[in-house]
Structure formats: structure tokens, C-alpha cells
Amino acid sequence: EIYPKQFEKLSQLSEQYSIGSAHFSTRENIQLHWVVLEDVSEIFRSLAEVGLTSREACGNSVRNVMCSPLSGVCSDEKFDSTPYALATAKFFLRNPMAQSLPRKFKFNFTCCEKHGMVRMVDVGLIPEIQQIDGSEQKGFKIFLGGGLGNRSFVGHQLEDFTPEEDLLYTSIA
């Protein structure tokens, strides 16, 4: 999530400390280029004032948790996965268990089978609903091990259905 006041602050910081433009990465991170080292602490303070951080933008950590922009509006989705993506991001942000991983680690939630990059990231999640004991149960189809590096891999399906109450435990594992 990003809000207008945060965009305004990023624009101001780009004009004041960078080259007047910002770059949006493929992981939905925003980069300011040509920043002078002496200005970095002030930039960090200014970002924090509007609820932004530079944490987990690089290094061997859980990176920005992505969610399809069609989540919540896609006619083929079983349910909106946005709250689950936000909760996952909140859990892993600044969490010590996610700070010194062997490599960067990427999550991607999508809305349905047709959209998103769930087979091209470390953990890809598609919302699913199953009938269990006569009632509808929300959960996710999970794919693991995808990547787009110099040796690309297509993720493999972990299981057909992980109930929503097990999602955090499965994500930690």
C-alpha cells in the first residue's frame, strides 16, 4: 500500500536529494538515484515521517511482498488476497528470522490462476476455497522455488490447499 502523502514525500525527496525522478522496481520498490551519502540519514528520517522504510529493499531478507493489482476486483478470484499479503509483509518486516537468510526471498499473492507471477517467485499464493465439513474454508494453493535469475526456475506446487489459519506457519517453514 502507498498513500498520496507518501507519494508527495517521495516526490519532494527526489527533487531535493536526487535527480528529480524515482524508479519503480519490478518488486514495487521505489529507488532514488544519485543520492549523496551525507543526505541519507535525513532521507531516512523523512521517509519514516510518512510511514515508509528502506528495510528489506535489498540484501538477504524477505523482500517486498507483492500482491496482484487485480486482487479484490478480478472476476475469477475466489476471494481478495490483499489482506493476506499485507499481513505477511507486516509479519516479516523487521522480523529477526527474516534478516539473514541465505538469499533474498520473495512472496507473491495473486487473485486467480490467470494473473500474477506465482510460479516465478520463491513463494506464490493463489486464493482457493474448499468445502470442509460442509462449510467453505478459505486457503491458498502454494507454489515454491520459482525464480527469474540467470538460471530461471518455474515454481513447483507444494499442495492444492493450505487453510488460511496455516498460512503463516507454512510461510515461516
Question: Model regions: which residues?
Answer:
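Internal alpha/beta scaffold segment
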Residues: 148-173
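Conserved histidines in hydrophobic membrane contexts and catalytic metal-binding motifs
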Residues: 140-143
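Small-residue-enriched alpha-helical segments and adjacent helix-cap loops
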Residues: 1-137
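Residue-level recognition of phosphate/Mg2+-coordinating polar/acidic sites
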Residues: 133, 146-148
